[in-house]
Amino acid sequence: DNTFSPLSVTPVNLGADVVIHSLTKYINGSSDTVGGVVCGTQEFINDLKNVNNGACMLLGSTMDSFRSASILKNMRTLHLRMKQHSFNAMYLANAFEALDIKTVYPGLKSHPSHEIFKTMFNEEFGFGGMLTIDVGSLEKANAVMELMQEKNLGYLAVSLGFYKTLFSAPGTSTSSEIPLDEQKEMGLSDGLIRFSIGLDND
């Protein structure tokens, strides 16, 4: 699943036989379309499309032409957008870390997989637009997110890849169905804020 890192990582070059993307996220980039894509060999795709036993029979309807055209149009700027998402995320990751806020971003040398990621990513497109900070408690996380909304610095949303910065507290949103003891084992704290960094030029 390369939804979080189109262009930044090319899984086929790393040995992947099948790559999937959510077109809803970075590839479309405007949060107005729902879709996905499966990439593989022609033989694999033909098997998926087989009307008798192909898995695509389970994946939903065919996208309408207007949405398809919208995604194709937005793909023309994907290379520019991914560079800016990555640039902004790197800037903010450095700023958060300089403030002694626990920051998780693969572009930081402090990230445990930084050196591994450097061997996999396409330098031209950076380390991607997703980062996480831990401010210590849910109360602080909520205060940060409320302040960001007041200052019009982004939107509270669990999506990603939008041109505007999106943020959410995983413990009370995307990970809320995971029991608290399992969240702790996974390193998820109440103070986590997940950011999908936008295209802002300031």
At which residue positions do the language-model features occur?
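Conserved PLP-enzyme active-site core in the AAT-like
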Residues: 1-104
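Short amphipathic alpha-helical segments with coiled-coil-like heptad repeat character
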Residues: 91-98, 152-155, 202
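Hydrophobic/aromatic-rich, well-ordered segments within soluble, folded domains that form packed cores
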Residues: 80, 84-91, 186-201
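Short, acidic Gly/Pro/Ser/Thr-rich loop/turn segments
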Residues: 45-46, 78, 138-141, 174-175, ...
